[in-house]
C-alpha cells in the first residue's frame, strides 16, 4: 500500500551476514540492539527525508533556475553563460546530487548535516569540509565563482541555499 515507505530493520542480530541478508531482503537501514534512542530517531528522520524527497514532483524531469538546467533523468547539467550560450557541464555523481538537492528546494537553507546525510550517507564519518570542497568545485563548474550574485549561497554556521533568480536568464 505504501511502496515508498522506508523499511528499517530493528533486531538483536548484529552479525555482518545478518545485516547483509536484511539489506538484500529490501530493508533501507538496519539497526541492531543495543542501540541509542537518539540514533534510532535520527535514522528514521533521515530515511523519511530521503523518502519524501523522492516524492517531489518534477513532471518534466528537469530542474531550472539561475541559468542552470538539470536533466534529472539523464543526469545532465546545462549552464547558460552571460553571453546566452548554453553549454553542457560535466559533473561528478556527488556534484550532480548536491546541485540537484539544492535545486529541488530553491530558496531554502539546507543544514550541512542534512546535505551530508542526503548526498553522502547518514553514516558519513568524515569532516564537513568535504562538503565545502565539493561546493567550491561545483560553483567553479557552474560559473558561480565569477558571478557577483551567487547561485549557491553559503549561510554561515548553517549550510547552503540555492538562489534560483541569482542570474537573469538570457
Language model features with spans:
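Generic detector of well-ordered alpha-helical packing
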Residues: 16-19, 29-30, 72, 96-98, ...
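Basic, amphipathic DNA-recognition helix from helix-turn-helix-like DNA-binding domains
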Residues: 1-64, 141, 170
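Residues in well-ordered alpha-helical elements
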Residues: 17-20, 38, 73, 113, ...
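Short, Lys/Arg-enriched segments at the junction into DNA-binding effector domains
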Residues: 46-109, 113, 162-164, 170
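Heptad-repeat coiled-coil signal-transmission/dimerization helices
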Residues: 37-40, 44, 74, 131, ...
